[in-house]
A protein has these predicted regions:
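Residue-level signature of transmembrane alpha-helical entry/exit and packing/kink sites
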Residues: 1-6, 72, 76, 91, ...
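Hydrophobic alpha-helical transmembrane segments
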Residues: 1-11, 82-87, 126-131, 215-238
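Membrane-proximal soluble regions of multi-pass membrane proteins
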Residues: 16-71, 208
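Membrane-water interface at transmembrane helix exits
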Residues: 17-21, 25, 87, 150-154, ...
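Long, charge-rich boundary regions
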Residues: 58, 62-122
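Functional transmembrane core segments of multi-pass inner-membrane proteins
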Residues: 93-192, 196, 229-237
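Interfacial loop-to-transmembrane junctions
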Residues: 193-218
Length: 238
C-alpha cells in the first residue's frame, strides 16, 4: 500500500512541477507534450517516469546530453513522501496543492488564491468539529499579527498571510504556532547559508511560502508528537 501511495504521489508531484513551470510561461500544461527544456525534443514515456527516468537516463537528456535540473527528481521524491504520509484522498490533494504553492512562490514570489482555495477546501474536511474553537483560533493566532506587520512594515506579502490563515484553520492554534516556529528556523538557516555562499544579499527578497509550507506539513503530520515530546522534556527539566 505504501508503494502505491508513493507512486501516485510522485506522479502527481511530477505533474504539479510541470504545471507550475508552464504556468509561469503561460503554456498549456494539460494537453501539450513534455519536451527537453534545452533541445526541445519531445520526451517519451521512459524519460518521464518519476524518479526512475532520471536514474535510467543518468540525469541527462537522452537526446542532447544536457543535464536534467535536480528540481525534477527532488520534487518527485518529495511527492512520493507526501503520498506515503497521506491518510486520505483529501490529505493527498492538500499536500500536493501545498507543494504547488511552495514551487510557484519560489519561482514567482506570489501565492495564488486559486491554490489557497484548494487547500482550504481540503483542510475543511480534516477538521474535527469537536475542537472547532481551537481551529478558529488557529486561523488568526499567526495570520493576524502577520497581517498587521504586512500593513505596517511590508515584511510579509498578503499571500503569506492568507496561507497562514488557511493553514491555521486546519492545524489548530498549537500546531499553527509550531509550524510557524519551524518556518522561522528553516527560513533563517537557509537565508544564512545563502548569504554565506553569496547567493543572496541582505536586500534580496526570499520567498516565505516554501518555508511556511514546510512548517505546515511537518506540524500537520507530526505536530502533536513534537509537542508531546517538548512537554515531556520540559517536565523533566531538560
Amino acid at each position: 500500500m505504501l508503494y502505491w501511495k508513493g507512486l501516485v504521489g510522485s506522479v502527481i508531484a511530477s505533474f504539479v512541477n510541470v504545471m507550475v513551470l508552464r504556468s509561469r510561461k503561460k503554456e498549456d500544461y494539460l494537453f501539450s507534450h513534455s519536451r527537453c527544456p534545452d533541445c526541445g525534443h519531445q520526451l517519451n514515456y521512459l524519460d518521464m517516469l518519476p524518479i526512475l527516468g532520471f536514474i535510467i537516463r543518468k540525469g541527462k537528456c537522452h537526446y542532447c546530453g544536457c543535464r536534467i535540473p535536480l528540481r525534477y527528481p527532488l520534487v518527485e521524491i518529495t511527492g512520493a513522501y507526501l503520498g506515503i504520509i497521506s491518510h486520505s484522498v483529501w490529505e493527498m490533494i492538500m499536500f500536493m496543492d501545498l507543494l504547488a504553492i511552495a514551487l510557484y512562490d519560489r519561482d514567482n514570489m506570489v501565492i495564488k488564491d486559486s491554490y489557497l482555495a484548494v487547500v482550504l477546501l481540503c483542510g475543511v474536511f480534516t477538521i474535527d468539529l469537536r475542537y472547532l474553537n481551537n481551529h478558529l483560533l488557529g486561523s488568526v493566532v499567526i495570520s493576524l499579527p502577520m497581517y498587521l506587520l504586512a500593513k505596517l512594515t511590508e515584511g510579509f506579502g498578503m499571500g503569506d498571510v492568507k496561507l497562514m490563515a488557511v493553514a491555521g484553520l486546519f492545524l489548530g492554534w498549537e500546531r499553527c504556532l509550531l509550524g510557524f516556529v519551524l518556518r522561522c528556523l528553516t527560513g533563517s538557516v537557509v537565508s544564512i547559508v545563502l548569504l554565506m555562499r553569496q547567493k543572496a544579499g541582505l536586500k534580496d527578497r526570499i520567498p516565505f511560502g516554501p518555508f511556511l509550507v514546510l512548517g505546515t506539513v511537518i506540524a500537520y503530520s507530526y505536530g502533536f508528537r513534537l509537542i508531546d515530546f517538548y512537554e515531556s522534556m520540559r517536565f523533566k527539566g531538560v
